């Protein structure tokens, strides 16, 4: 997570929680001159479109006042979905036994992309079983990870 993303999480979490939701995570994606801030919210009863609209208004008001992003950007607020991104250690713990795909920041075992079953989680590492091989991957080396939805 970048410094900007960390600052945004700290800034937005209280407002999201005040609405009764949990800030699952966020990502700031830049593609040339176009940027998108994606904020994922959760609730044990699920998230509706109205919930996303309420959270979007609250988040937008905070961002307008604090102005942490200097360039133009689009704000998207949604539930994490069935193929949810994994941001925090407890997300990985909840996903144990699930199939996940991930990309590491630095190459590991000669590659950066992995897909397999998440079989163990510790405070700083996960174990991923892929094609009969177990890979120990530091949480700090994971750039992006998500659950693979099964239908």
From Swiss-Prot:
Keywords: Cytoplasm, Ribosome biogenesis. It comes from the Bacteria. The keyword Cytoplasm applies. It is found in: Cytoplasm. GO terms for cellular component: cytosol. GO terms for biological process: ribosomal small subunit assembly; translation. Gene3D superfamilies: Ribosome maturation factor RimP, C-terminal domain, RimP-like superfamily, N-terminal. InterPro entries: Ribosome_maturation_RimP (IPR003728), RimP_C (IPR028998), RimP_C_sf (IPR036847), RimP_N (IPR028989), RimP_N_sf (IPR035956). PANTHER family: RIBOSOME MATURATION FACTOR RIMP. Belongs to the RimP family. Required for maturation of 30S ribosomal subunits. This is Ribosome maturation factor RimP.
